[in-house]
Amino acid sequence: MAKRQLNRRQNWRIEKIQGERAARAAKRESSAVEALEGGDLGPEQHGLVIAHFGVQVEVEAVDGELAGQVFRCHLRANLPALVTGDQVVWRAGNQGIGVIVAQLPRTTELCRPDSRGQLKPVAANVDMIVIVFAPLPEPHANLIDRYLVAAEHAGIRPLLLLNKFDLIDEQNAPALNALLAVYRTLGYPVLEVSAHHGNGMEQLQKQLDGRISVFVGQSGVGKSSLVNSLLPEVETRVGPLSELSGQGTHTTTTARLFHFPGGGELIDSPGIREFGLGHVSRADVEAGFIEFNDLLGTCRFRDCKHDREPGCALLKALEDGRVQQQRMNSYRSIIASLPENGY
């Protein structure tokens, strides 16, 4: 069934209702914060946001006698939006409740546009983006490349992870091997694992230890199964593949941070089927394709669009085999998806 199209007035009413609900929630939250701050609160200390629940977040104490304990915290009204991975200053109250008083500067942030096109951070202080894909659902180079552009744009190290490699057979092996070869040639780290059978999981754990990582990828590629294998004590519900579409069903409902014994952390975030890049410019996308770096600025025309222009350095590199057709197709698809002002 086709998705119902809403007219302008219906959209306005929906936004008005959502705005009123948000205002009421903010008022209740402000009253709760005032009540807490009017009581007995502990001294200011550092904490780590490990989960987000609407107007409240879960904060783990990182130092002092409360280290390792988790508190459900309210936010002061003047604070910016917080996400999992944020480092904060907070004060503890009674019965596992606290108040966040300040957000500490972020080293990195992973953002994507929301349904209204506004840029929204989804994770903070991430060191590595693990791009998960699998033989089923069939991997798409375009989606992988979108994640890579996002990683390059955010200054976060990417790791390509092929899960369920035990499902590789004679039919899908040639295409998968060709796909992986492109990224290995570019110098991107690639791992092949099976969360179900345990193959390659030790190598993955070594990559994750000592870093804050986030798993991204379309639903059904086994992100929750990977978490269950890496952290058996954590129960992350696993969703089956849809028999009709071959796509996965979303299981994780909120971004949550988990600790590894080796000192690293993992942020398990909701599955993302189509990763939006509407917040980046053409120059950002071009910079996200690392094989373009030595070619950009060497075209005959300064405003070259790398389409059919004579003297285009990228087209010459494509012809010579220095740029793969698969990557050029992804680049053109991403550029075409940008809003006009992104050009």
UniProtKB/Swiss-Prot annotation:
Tell me which residues make up the CP-type G domain: 116-275
Q: Where does Zn(2+) bind?
A: 299, 304, 306, 312
Gene Ontology MF, one: GTPase activity
Q: Which CDD domains match?
A: YjeQ_EngC
Please give the SUPFAM superfamilies that the UniProt record associates with this protein: P-loop containing nucleoside triphosphate hydrolases
Q: Which species does the entry assign this protein to?
A: Pseudomonas fluorescens (strain Pf0-1)
Question: What is the gene called?
Answer: rsgA
| Name of the protein in question | Small ribosomal subunit biogenesis GTPase RsgA
The set of disulfide-linked cysteines is none
Query: Which cofactors does this protein require?
Result: Zn(2+)
Which segments cross the bilayer?
A: none
Tree of life domain? Bacteria
Q: Report the protein's function.
A: One of several proteins that assist in the late maturation steps of the functional core of the 30S ribosomal subunit. Helps release RbfA from mature subunits. May play a role in the assembly of ribosomal proteins into the subunit. Circularly permuted GTPase that catalyzes slow GTP hydrolysis, GTPase activity is stimulated by the 30S ribosomal subunit.
**Which proteins does it associate with, and in what oligomeric form?**
Monomer. Associates with 30S ribosomal subunit, binds 16S rRNA.
Q: How is the cofactor bound?
A: Binds 1 zinc ion per subunit.
User: Where in or outside the cell is it found?
Assistant: Cytoplasm
Please name the HAMAP family in this protein's record. GTPase_RsgA
